[in-house]
Curated annotation (Swiss-Prot):
Highly expressed in the cerebral cortex and frontal lobe, slightly less in the cerebellum, occipital and temporal lobes, relatively low in the medulla and putamen, and lowest in the spinal cord. No expression detected in the pancreas. Highly expressed in fetal brain and occipital lobe, slightly less in the whole brain, frontal lobe, hippocampus, and lung, very low expression in cerebellum, medulla oblongata, temporal lobe, testis, kidney and appendix. SUPFAM superfamilies: P-loop containing nucleoside triphosphate hydrolases. Atypical sulfotransferase family member with very low affinity for 3'-phospho-5'-adenylyl sulfate (PAPS) and very low catalytic activity towards L-triiodothyronine, thyroxine, estrone, p-nitrophenol, 2-naphthylamine, and 2-beta-naphthol. May have a role in the metabolism of drugs and neurotransmitters in the CNS. It is an enzyme of class 2 (transferase). One of its GO terms (cellular component) is cytoplasm. The keyword Transcription does not apply. This is Sulfotransferase 4A1. The keyword Coiled coil does not apply. Belongs to the sulfotransferase 1 family. Signal peptide: none annotated. PANTHER family: SULFOTRANSFERASE SULT. It is found in: Cytoplasm.
C-alpha cells in the first residue's frame, strides 16, 4: 500500500466495504484471489521471513535484519530502496511470480496471520522473525497510516478507528489473534518472537538474538559495531522528518488516548489477552 496524500478519503462505511472476509479474517482487497497460491508458495531453507501485524515497526525491523544478515551499514541502507530487497508476499508489487524467482537468500515480509502463511513455513522449512508492538501505540500509528493512503484512506475519527481495532474490524483481522497465534509458536525452532519496545529498551540483547538466530557469527567487537549501527537505524527511524513527530517512540498513545478511551481499551485488552502470558511495555 503506497503511502501518499489521499485524493478521495473514505467515510467509515466506504472504508469498511473495501475489505473482504477470508475464513473469518478481514483482508485488504489486493489479497483477494491469491490466498490459495500464497498457502502453496514454495519456500526455501535459506529464506528469512519477517512477519508483523501492520504498523508494528516493520520498516525498522527489516533494516536491522538486513544490516545484521548482510553486514551492511546504515549509510548503505539509507541509499538503497530497502523495500525492493524485502518484498511483501501478498502485495500487488512485485507479485508472487517475481518473488518466487528471487535469488537466495531471499528476505520476504508479510502481514498475514500465521495460519495463512505458506504451509511450508508451518513445517519449519524457513526462518521466521515475528515482531509485536504494544497495541495502543500500534493503533495510533495505524490510524495515521490510513489517513495518508491514496487507495484506502480513512476519514473517520480516531475514536471510531480505535473501536474498529478493538472489534477486530481492520485489515489483517484481529491484532489480538495475530500476536497470540505467533506467541503460541514462539518455541518453534524456526521462529524468533520479538517485541518492538525491546528495540528501545535493550537493543544489545535483540541484536544478539538476531545474530544467533540468523547464524551470523561475530566476536564482541563485531557485535558492538553491529549494535552501534542498529542504534543509528533506530534513531533515524524515530527522528525522520517525514514522520509525524514521535511516531516511532514508545508511549505515543498517551498523547492521543482520552481517559475514557484508555479505560475501554484496557477492558477489551484484558478480555482478549487475559489467558495469554504475553506482556507488553506501554511506556518506557
Amino acid at each position: 500500500m503506497a503511502e501518499s496524500e489521499a485524493e478521495t478519503p473514505s467515510t467509515p462505511g466506504e472504508f469498511e466495504s473495501k475489505y473482504f472476509e477470508f475464513h473469518g479474517v478481514r483482508l485488504p482487497p489486493f489479497c483477494r484471489g491469491k490466498m490459495e497460491e500464497i498457502a502453496n508458495f514454495p519456500v526455501r531453507p535459506s529464506d528469512v521471513w519477517i512477519v508483523t501485524y501492520p504498523k508494528s515497526g516493520t520498516s525498522l525491523l527489516q533494516e536491522v535484519v538486513y544490516l545484521v544478515s548482510q553486514g551492511a551499514d546504515p549509510d548503505e541502507i539509507g541509499l538503497m530502496n530497502i523495500d525492493e530487497q524485502l518484498p511483501v508476499l501478498e502485495y500487488p508489487q512485485p507479485g508472487l511470480d517475481i518473488i518466487k524467482e528471487l535469488t537466495s537468500p531471499r528476505l520476504i515480509k508479510s502481514h498475514l496471520p500465521y495460519r495463512f502463511l505458506p504451509s511450508d513455513l508451518h513445517n519449519g522449512d524457513s526462518k521466521v522473525i515475528y515482531m509485536a508492538r504494544n497495541p495502543k501505540d500500534l493503533v495510533v500509528s495505524y490510524y495515521q497510516f490510513h489517513r495518508s493512503l491514496r487507495t484506502m484512506s480513512y476519514r473517520g475519527t480516531f475514536q471510531e478507528f480505535c473501536r474498529r481495532f478493538m472489534n477486530d474490524k481492520l485489515g489483517y483481522g484481529s491484532w489480538f489473534e495475530h500476536v497470540q497465534e505467533f506467541w503460541e509458536h514462539r518455541m518453534d525452532s524456526n521462529v524468533l518472537f520479538l517485541k518492538y519496545e525491546d528495540m528501545h529498551r535493550d537493543l544489545v540483547t535483540m541484536v544478539e538474538q538476531l545474530a544467533r538466530f540468523l547464524g551470523v557469527s561475530c566476536d564482541k567487537a563485531q557485535l558492538e559495531a553491529l549494535t552501534e549501527h542498529c542504534h543509528q537505524l533506530v534513531d533515524q527511524c524515530c527522528n525522520a522528518e517525514a514522520l509525524p513527530v514521535g511516531r516511532g517512540r514508545v508511549g505515543l498513545w498517551k498523547d492521543i488516548f482520552t481517559v475514557s478511551m484508555n479505560e475501554k481499551f484496557d477492558l477489551v485488552y484484558k478480555q482478549k489477552m487475559g489467558k495469554c502470558d504475553l506482556t507488553f511495555d506501554f511506556y518506557l
